[in-house]
């Protein structure tokens, strides 16, 4: 039966050393001393207490055994276990399971290889303890007992044993501790169990390097491995005062920092917003600087991860924003893949226990090299995150696209890849819009905006607009406008024209960007492939829309009808209409009835070439009475109207029709002046022969003829200017533009330019208000002349009628054989004639006043024309005063026209 001494931990430890090395007790004294120091030291547990690290080891082991299903099941079970708070020491349970799963048949091969490793390595690492031989029964191994005696001896194991290797790296021999001298065993009860636990854990750590015996460690390799493990022992060892941290400890901390997790010695400083090595750590400056440089990856990782975490749950961020976050997550996954490789490398070194040399270990300098490219990628991503703050939709895509304009091909390829992911939703919106006319933009990311409150009649003008801030920078404004027009044309056809033709018949639909890779391929050829798709859809859709408007809704026919009726282009119709309306329009405006005027309009249509127009056009032609003011006649309130609805109302909007109404009133008034002067000339021709027997009246008639001739010249020049220089020239430009128009917007724009030109040159704009007032004053003087001439002719004809009656009465009496006149009758007749002759100077005076006012107004009108910014109006002044009649009367005209003439001669 074995004695108690033979069962003591000391004896068992010595037997273990002899068994491993295969030598006698005297030959293993040196190794036994090292084993005693290891067991008696304050090393921390050799296995990292990391639950997830152990879980990863278990999964890797299952995968290595080709048990992928079990690995997936284990991952799910571990997730459920982690979410429950029933178990406190989950790491211990997982580590136990991992230990139990090890194959016991592999142990003999380990021991055979450990023997060589143990025999070669320990003599070099035990030089801090003197060689001596003591009975193993006398060696106390309890750390508590040793610590109690450390106060009595300055050479205790705690200060001179293996625990000091981490600080001084086995700096030299030390005196033998008194506690290890023979005969001083003072073990406490239960020390055997404690020793077994310490022995198992220490040797499990020391003897884990599964290396072939033929590969002997070098003198440089072992201290490196021991130094790595010494640092691990400090984590639960010395915690007071400054600590010396080795590079291996920094490497492990850095790998955690790379993931945004604080290490034991490197932590995030929230005040300075950076990672810092703790101040109490005793670390060389080079290692500290290198650690700080490497920690920048953790800061960059945190910045990117914080952005994605905040935005991933924000639904209002939109599809483009979510794509950006997905692109960032994809890059982070690649980054995590690198970290997993580094962790595997570090874990492999930990699993081997003792390193073979520095050339295969993970160092800070190697990390600097391996993380150079990832750092550039993270810096680029962090810069993108900063630049994209507060942006969404197309604006976000523009921000990403701005970073593709760099000379660094590595950075450009990265950003282009992200851009292909970010722009994929934008291109999906775009193709859905240009091929289907559908706009599903819940978060307002697309550059085409829709206003659901707009009614159908304003669909083309107001319903769809461009969000300029959302236009991606890789698209031009012309491309954006075409994209807007394509979808707008499709919706206009469906909703306004009620044309349900499928878009596949209008457009040759090409393959759209169905994936980010398709989008990336498209971006490589923006000027050809992308532009070609947009141009094809634009031309085909616009052409189809214009064909529908022209063939089905007769857009061009309605435009020509506007020219003929509202702009007085149908001359025979307008003249006949004036003749028919004259009896009605001379009456007060309050006595007019619209149905009477409508009947006259229909009569004029049937009596002229207007009857050959399309019934659809004639149906829209109508009479409109303007608002009546006191004293207005029918001429002042009468107007023609043209009803528009449906698709053509998109071109002829209410604003356009109001412009047509203003122009019609102006042209109608000018045409009326021409009509009045024509009547005046007729009166001259008809009454000239009748009043030939009244020589005293010739002066009045002469003044009337002169003033009427001036007015006729003025009106003829104005009519020529309005008809040819304004209407015909503008209409010719409009018609050419309409024939060449590629889309409906071109027609609308050309039509608006046409109306604006007419409004401006017909003196109806705000800048020509003074000219228009003078022109209206001229028109008023023409009406005054008509009234004055009518009164003069009326008085003259009445006088002529009386004289003829007197002569007829005289002849009748002579035939009857009576005296022709009596003295009293002759005297009365002479008196009446004398009174009439006395009224002639008043008539002449009235005509002179009228002439003076008229000429003054014309002179002021000419002065305003010469100072106009419109060159055509300045040229009009030359035609109105072609013989310089007004120039001789107005000094301002002499200066203005003379200066203008000299300028013209110089040019």
Swiss-Prot record:
Keywords: Acetylation, Cytoplasm, Cytoskeleton, Microtubule, Phosphoprotein. GO terms for biological process: cytoplasmic microtubule organization; meiotic cell cycle; microtubule nucleation; mitotic cell cycle; single fertilization; spindle assembly. The modification N-acetylalanine is found at residue 2. It comes from the Eukaryota. Ubiquitously expressed. Component of the gamma-tubulin ring complex (gTuRC) which mediates microtubule nucleation. The gTuRC regulates the minus-end nucleation of alpha-beta tubulin heterodimers that grow into microtubule protafilaments, a critical step in centrosome duplication and spindle formation. Residues 210-241 are annotated as: Disordered. Transmembrane segments: none annotated. This is Gamma-tubulin complex component 3. It is found in: Cytoplasm, Cytoskeleton, Microtubule organizing center, Centrosome. It comes from Homo sapiens. Disulfide bonds: none annotated. Belongs to the TUBGCP family. Residues 210-230 have a biased composition (Polar residues). One of its GO terms (cellular component) is cytosol. Component of the gamma-tubulin ring complex (gTuRC) consisting of TUBGCP2, TUBGCP3, TUBGCP4, TUBGCP5 and TUBGCP6 and gamma-tubulin TUBG1 or TUBG2. TUBGCP2, TUBGCP3, TUBGCP4, TUBGCP5 and TUBGCP6 assemble in a 5:5:2:1:1 stoichiometry; each is associated with a gamma-tubulin, thereby arranging 14 gamma-tubulins in a helical manner. Gamma-tubulin at the first position is blocked by TUBGCP3 at the last position, allowing 13 protafilaments to grow into a microtubule. Pfam families: GCP_C_terminal, GCP_N_terminal. InterPro entries: GCP, GCP_C, GCP_C_sf, GCP_N. The modification Phosphoserine is found at residue 113.
